[in-house]
Amino acid sequence: MLKLVENVVERVSSEETKVQEVQVPQSSIDEELKKIVEQIKARIHVVGVGGAGCNTVNRMMEVGVTGAKIIAVNTDAQDLLKVKAHQKILIGKEITRGLGAGNDPKIGEEAAKESEREIREALEGADMVFVTCGLGGGTGTGAAPVIAEMARKMGALTVSVVTLPFTMEGIRRAKNAEYGLKRLAKASDTVIVIPNDKLLEVAPKLPIQMAFKVADEILVQAVKGITELITKPGLVNLDFNDVRAVMKDGGVAMIGIGESDSEKRALEAAEQALNSPLLDVDISGAKGALISISGADVKLEEAQQIIEYVTRNVDPKAQVIWGIQLEPELEKTIRVMVIVTGITSRYVTFQEETPAPSEEETTPVKIDIPEL
């Protein structure tokens, strides 16, 4: 058996160093097979809503997300103009005149409802929709739940990925975020929550502007990680139905990320992911887990260590799915991203609906703007 392994390793290494052109005759049904593959391919749309959501999709366009349509949605025309996306939608033109929602979630909600037809057209045909935003402002907080509800009613697996505001951003944004998160959790199959305050535990001396960029990057990694396990050829890919099984009606989810380049890199990366400050919950009751393993040269033994470690820490009946992406730029590092679903979180309770923040709390200072 060992000799067989050595022979395979030698052959593959030889093939990688000396690429040979091999002419493979085309089968008569190849074209038909290509059409079928194209038809059954999962159609994934990523919708960034509001300022933070648009920052996230802008970053996604920079790094690239294989097999996803990127859509930017905002009430602020000036901000939307700067964003890179496959499609842009300025919502609430009548209500906001392209000037934004003024930190009022009610205006964001009404803007999305006003532009329902455009949003539905953009979501048409999607099998899976990611809705990403930063909660606490007006557009993301108000419009994201409306968009998520539309996507879900249209039959798409709907996963929202959101950040909660830093404490330093004030009580008004915190109240807005609480209201928006409860509505979003009800509108989505799964909502992945990233508390920005937890970033400060990782790097307490991080400059404010850099902290926001780190939050954006975590959103990007979450969406890109899940999407490319389905769409991008890798060492081990996930079937869309596997992802649906874990995230359909998955409730509240949280994410942990870890990486290591030591001798025990696999186990250390898994431990870091599950002990990440971002994963601020007891995961022993988690009903599902999605594991994304990335590295330049991930070994089978290492993948097994990671999967076994995560499986031991969640509910014994939890559905655990995993995939491996080859990322040459990681060199000797293994990165592990774990998303646990069906958890109980202090950030979301469904005992009562939080009322929309009062006008006094949310209305910005009135500025007379002359009619153009």
Swiss-Prot record:
PROSITE patterns: FTSZ_1 (PS01134), FTSZ_2 (PS01135)
Cellular location(s): Cytoplasm
GO terms, molecular function: GTP binding; GTPase activity
Keyword check for Nucleotidyltransferase: no
SUPFAM superfamilies in alphabetical order: Tubulin C-terminal domain-like, Tubulin nucleotide-binding domain-like
Residues reported to bind GTP: G51, A52, G53, C54, N55, G138, T139, G140, E169, R173, D216
Keyword Cell inner membrane annotated: no
Pfam families, alphabetized: FtsZ_C, Tubulin
Keywords assigned by UniProt, alphabetized: Cell cycle, Cell division, Cytoplasm, GTP-binding, Nucleotide-binding, Septation
Subunit structure: Homodimer. Polymerizes to form a dynamic ring structure in a strictly GTP-dependent manner. Interacts directly with several other division proteins.
NCBIfam families (alphabetical): ftsZ
Protein function: Essential cell division protein that forms a contractile ring structure (Z ring) at the future cell division site. The regulation of the ring assembly controls the timing and the location of cell division. One of the functions of the FtsZ ring is to recruit other cell division proteins to the septum to produce a new cell wall between the dividing cells. Binds GTP and shows GTPase activity.
The protein's name: Cell division protein FtsZ 1
Species the sequence originates in: Pyrococcus horikoshii (strain ATCC 700860 / DSM 12428 / JCM 9974 / NBRC 100139 / OT-3)
